[in-house]
Amino acid sequence: MKTAIFTVVLALAVFAVLSFGWEANEKALSEEFTELIHEKEAASETEARGCRYFWGECHDHMPCCDWLVCRYKWPITYNICVWNRTFPEK
């Protein structure tokens, strides 16, 4: 009986250690992913864009790309660029 209880306690201790290690690894991966997203976001902000892309917010001073048109779509409260059913010429 003592052996069975000792085995159960030992198994619980092993599971606790493994789950703690897994949680620490998961947190490190989450931090790396967040840093990667911030780097990509910063890189895309530095690019100069001449037009707004699909589902991008548009106004007179922010035109859509050639194959898109600026439309008001409910329930969105601002104008967005939507496809005008044409394809861009290459």
Curated annotation (Swiss-Prot):
Stretch forming the signal peptide: 1-19
Domain of life the protein comes from: Eukaryota
Q: What is its main location?
A: secreted
GO cellular component terms, semicolon-separated: extracellular region
Q: Name the organs or tissues of expression.
A: Expressed by the venom gland.
Disulfide linkages recorded for this protein, renumbered to the chain, are: C51-C65, C58-C70, C64-C81
Do you know which InterPro entries this protein is assigned to? Huwentoxin-1 (IPR011696)
Q: Which GO terms describe its molecular function?
A: ion channel inhibitor activity; toxin activity
**Subcellular localization(s) per the UniProt record:** Secreted
Q: Which residues form a coiled coil?
A: none
- Which ranges are cleaved off as propeptide? 20-50
Which key words are in the record? Disulfide bond, Ion channel impairing toxin, Knottin, Secreted, Signal, Toxin
Q: Which family does it belong to?
A: Belongs to the neurotoxin 10 (Hwtx-1) family. 13 (Hntx-13) subfamily.
Q: What does this protein do?
A: Ion channel inhibitor.
Q: Supply the domain comment.
A: The presence of a 'disulfide through disulfide knot' structurally defines this protein as a knottin.
Q: What is this protein called?
A: U7-theraphotoxin-Hhn1f
